[in-house]
Amino acid sequence: MTKFLLAVGSGGFVGSILRFLIFKYFENPQTTGWPWGTFTVNILGSLLAGILFGISEKTNLIPETLSLFLLVGFCGGFTTFSAFALDNLKLFQAGAFMQNFLYISATILLGVLAIFIGHFLATSVLK
């Protein structure tokens, strides 16, 4: 059990740091009008989760500990629904209702599409 906890924790550590760096790369959403950092990590994280899940479904290439590190730890630390929710609150409070609606719609649609694409790519390559 300890090795699983360490795998999840260290994956979360790495994912959170990468998320922070991506947030820093993009401008402040209050100046651009769009929370690019959160949007980017959620779409990329969904794509990666789809790829990893597809590989796990078709092969035994990813041991359980590595799967926990990548899917639960890294993807969990990298993507962030709470930041997505907070971005929406800020857009709403700023009166940016159309941007708020577009951000919610685009994140959900592209996030789900990205996980399907990632899964398709992984399972197609591994046939």
Segments the model singles out, each with a brief description of its role:
Residues 1-127:
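Membrane-interface helix-loop junctions in multi-pass transporters/channels
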